[in-house]
Amino acid sequence: MTDEKVINKKLVGDNKLFRHQAKFVAGAMDIKQLPNFALPQIAFVGKSNVGKSSLINTICNNKKLAKVSNTPGRTRQINFFNLVDKLIIVDLPGYGFAQVPNQVKDQWEILINHYLRKSDNLKLVNLLIDSRRGIKENDKKVAELLLANKRDFQIIFTKSDKVTDRKNLNLEAQNFLATLNYSCNLIYVSSRSKEGARELKTSLAKCIKLEK
């Protein structure tokens, strides 16, 4: 068996990890509450109402895991989910919601910045962007923050079932990444149609495998 076939076989095996249900294990609203897990962590971050909770539920095979709401700004803490003691999925608070008080926004920023700087086991961040809206200024700032903290990330375009023209969106993403001198995966996902779910799971499994 060739090395490539061995790698692909291992990735398929790791992909089966996501057939299990993840469980909520901790929530942190301030720095003191941040848990210290020895397991590898993969985080999800995006603008409020980008579809983050729905995607996490799909990835973790648990429809009730992350609370899904039509109200932006619902996720107000960092939530940690344990996937059969193999992986920690991290749900970061959404950004860019104008109705959240400035004091709360400041608290979120401090909390998220600290987590990104100090988490030794954070292997990858998934930057979620609404494919209908394109890359906004807040998204760019988060990408810059991730690179400033030397965090690998990939771009996940959500709600892909509602968009037909992806050529311009891909070009926009590539042009932005070029300004950062960075390259990464661009994955289109839809929690409704399940498009991209397998590709995303495989990318996460590959990330964990490379870190072993």
Curated annotation (Swiss-Prot):
Residues 38-210 form the EngB-type G domain. It comes from the Bacteria. Keywords: Cell cycle, Cell division, GTP-binding, Magnesium, Metal-binding, Nucleotide-binding, Septation. GO terms for molecular function: GTP binding; metal ion binding. GTP binds at residues 46-53, 73-77, 91-94, 158-161, 189-191. Pfam families: MMR_HSR1 (PF01926). Mg(2+) binds at residues 53, 75. One of its GO terms (biological process) is division septum assembly. Its cofactor is Mg(2+). HAMAP family: GTPase_EngB. Necessary for normal cell division and for the maintenance of normal septation. Belongs to the TRAFAC class TrmE-Era-EngA-EngB-Septin-like GTPase superfamily. EngB GTPase family. This is Probable GTP-binding protein EngB. It comes from Rickettsia bellii (strain OSU 85-389).
